[in-house]
């Protein structure tokens, strides 16, 4: 068993973890960055970057639909779902590449790839053969979407907001469960791109004006 000692161990190499690591180094302390999954922040890989790319395509389609009202007649709008998603993934991967480069620029002695767990206060087990001793531990693991048990019986037909950007083509129809920011953004974008969208929400009335307009 290999034992490594640092002033601070940071679990998670996303935006928060990277910021914590840099802050520790800026104060002259030793730090290690631990990541069990692929490098690339939530924003770049499955969050704001790919979602805004999908929204940009949706806004282009929506603008073309609304153009006749301004005296501009572009003709029938044809949406190529495969081309839309190919561009989303291509640009997303480019953004992720910048993040990966940033992580990989860190001294290899100060970054570990593996899942960490506490075995005692100030002691982490990383993978099968590394222990990390640290005076302080920053937990910046983020979160993952959860599928309710009653929906898991639908198998592969159920996807999360993380999965939508891996599709090769736009779906013909989709049921969006949840009217939060993510659900509304994706639901509106897909609807503007020709997807039949049904929105399911627990609240009867939404008072926030922007969300009302989106619905």
Report each predicted region and the residues it spans.
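Cofactor-binding loop segments of dinucleotide-utilizing enzymes, especially the Rossmann-like FAD-
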Residues: 13, 36, 179, 202
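Beta1/beta-strand and adjacent pyrophosphate-binding region of the FAD-binding site
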Residues: 2-14, 172-177
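N-terminal Rossmann-like FAD-binding beta1-loop-alpha1 element of flavoenzymes
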Residues: 8-32, 185-191
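Glycine/Thr-rich phosphate-binding loops of Rossmann-like dinucleotide-binding domains
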Residues: 19, 147-149, 185-186, 215
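Rossmann-like NAD(P)H-binding beta-loop-alpha module
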Residues: 169-199
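Glycine-rich flavin
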Residues: 3-6, 22-29, 34-170, 203, ...
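Residue-level detector of conserved catalytic or cofactor/ligand-binding positions
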Residues: 201-215
